[in-house]
Regions:
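Beta-sheet-rich non-transmembrane sensory/scaffold domains
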Residues: 1-334
Length: 334
């Protein structure tokens, strides 16, 4: 029931855009898994974080059309199962006209959406009454988040891209880490930010939340990262030099923000001899589009006083107090 002709938008495009949602019961007992019902929602769903079941109600965030279409907007719809029919019982429509959703997070009675065209509006929604959801607050800042993580009930920890405003649009630039205070949902505030590299810098965590490793017991944030420098990201030019490929580990707290603890180098597999060149940079171009961001390191695990970083070719073990020194390395190609 979903009608989408292509990725882009052009003037005069009028196709309807709908998504069908199917509900199933899942269980281990015989015949415990089965079809329960369906419903239709306007627009398209970004990813799994755009759907959430809470106290018997399904909340869904969608975008209709695509930026910069004047018809582009987003919607939060709340569904209730009524005898096999998923019916909309509450809705907030026409959110952020001309923009599209870049990240979503539902947390109990609240919802958070980041949209983007040239700035990053963070919207906070009150979903306590499923039949009367409402917008509580909004914050507009440069850039956008592609993943939002609940640091605690009143703070969001996010990763995304910084952006340089060009008037009618914006260039995405370096990788952006942010902490938002949403204690007062009517007045969300950016309390800390960290920009890594310039345009062309990338992380697997930008497009895959499994690469985003926030370890709350130690207030540590471990992120796969490709760092590019040089060039002029504000004018759309990609970085001219890759200065780091590997895992970056930050101390991340609400009180103090981000402090780089250290780095675990994983030189890119395309590098000659798997080492840095004579200028101290990694031999690989700096170019990526935000929707297919990736990095050499794919995952990390923090265990006791050690961090394990995993790429497609190796696993490294490093002590959290001496990240630049490898304790052990295991090749996955031999």
């Amino acid at each position: 029931h979903r009608q989408i002709a292509g990725w882009g938008w052009y003037s005069g495009r009028t196709e309807a855009e709908l998504s069908t949602i199917h509900k199933f019961s899942i269980g281990a007992a015989p015949r415990a898994t089965g079809y329960l019902g369906s419903g239709i929602v306007k627009g398209r769903v970004l990813n799994q974080f755009a759907m959430d079941d809470h106290q018997g109600f399904l909340r869904v965030a969608t975008t209709t059309s695509r930026a910069p279409s004047p018809d582009a907007h987003s919607t939060i719809s709340v569904f209730e199962d009524k005898g096999g029919r998923l019916e909309v019982v509450g809705q907030i429509d026409q959110i952020a006209k001309t923009e599209d959703i870049r990240s979503v997070r539902f947390d109990g009675a609240r919802g958070y959406i980041v949209t983007f065209k040239k700035t990053d509006p963070l919207f906070v929604f009150d979903l306590a009454d499923p039949r009367a959801p409402r917008t509580m607050g909004e914050l507009k800042i440069p850039g956008f988040s592609t993943y939002m993580h609940m640091m605690d009930p009143t703070h969001l920890l996010t990763i995304g891209y910084d952006a340089a405003d060009q008037g009618s649009f914006a260039y995405f630039t370096g990788v952006l880490l942010q902490i938002f205070d949403v204690t007062n949902p009517s007045d969300p505030r950016l309390v800390h930010k960290e920009v890594i590299g310039t345009r062309g810098s990338s992380s697997e965590a930008l497009t895959n939340h499994l690469a985003f490793n926030y370890f709350a017991p130690k207030n540590l944030l471990a992120l796969p990262m490709t760092v590019c420098e040089g060039g002029n990201g504000a004018s759309g030019q990609y970085g001219t030099q890759m200065t780091f490929s590997g895992l970056m580990v930050y101390d991340a707290t609400v009180a103090s923000g981000f402090a780089l603890r250290g780095k675990v180098a994983h030189p890119n597999s395309a590098t000659s001899g798997d080492a840095q060149n004579t200028f101290g940079y990694y031999d690989m171009g700096c170019s990526n589009w935000w929707t297919n961001a990736t990095s050499e390191v794919k995952r990390s695990i923090i265990m006791d006083d050690y961090v394990f970083s995993v790429s497609e070719t190796r696993i490294k073990v490093n002590h959290l107090n001496a990240l630049s020194t490898d304790v052990k390395e295991l090749s996955l190609t031999q």
